[in-house]
């Protein structure tokens, strides 16, 4: 088994996650990302943002959520930035993506990584 990486839950992520997920579901998300930080699909042109599908209990096939997080490479934490229920939107809006890309670029600079 590989080493787990650190996972950071941002305030924006937590505010939304506590409204749409149970504590157990939130904990499971952290566990999955810690074990497999590269599991999400990289969003093109997003400075490394990833999107991961999440199942939410008792909500049926279309009742899941989408997690948006940043992961650069080994030695860096994964940062959970945003989550939204599938019934709210299929994807991020252009404005949301732009804001999250700005956050990812700040994280890259802050952690000393290269784009």
What is the meaning of each model-derived region?
Residues 3, 71-115:
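Enriched for short, Lys/Arg-rich terminal
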Residues 1, 14, 35-37, 85, ...:
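Preference for short coil/turn "hinge" residues that link or interrupt alpha-helices
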Residues 23-26, 62, 97:
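Amphipathic alpha-helical transducer elements in NTP-driven molecular machines
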Residues 39-83, 88:
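Basic/aromatic recognition patch in beta-strand/loop cores that engages polyanionic ligands
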Residues 12, 21-41:
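Compact soluble domain cores
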Residues 1-24:
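Arg/Lys-rich, positively charged N-terminal/basic patches that mediate binding to nucleic acids
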Residues 16, 32, 103, 107:
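Residues that form generic nucleotide/phosphate-binding pockets
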């Amino acid at each position: 088994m590989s080493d787990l990486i650190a996972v950071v839950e941002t305030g924006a992520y937590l505010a939304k996650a506590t409204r749409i997920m149970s504590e157990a579901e939130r904990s499971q998300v952290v566990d999955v990302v810690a074990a497999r930080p590269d599991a999400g699909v990289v969003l093109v042109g997003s400075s490394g943002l990833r999107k991961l599908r999440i199942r939410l209990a008792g909500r049926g096939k279309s009742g899941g959520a989408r997690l948006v997080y940043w992961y650069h490479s080994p030695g860096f934490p994964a940062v959970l930035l945003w989550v939204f229920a599938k019934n709210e939107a299929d994807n991020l809006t252009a404005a949301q993506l732009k804001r999250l890309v700005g956050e990812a670029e700040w994280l890259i600079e802050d952690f000393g990584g290269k784009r």
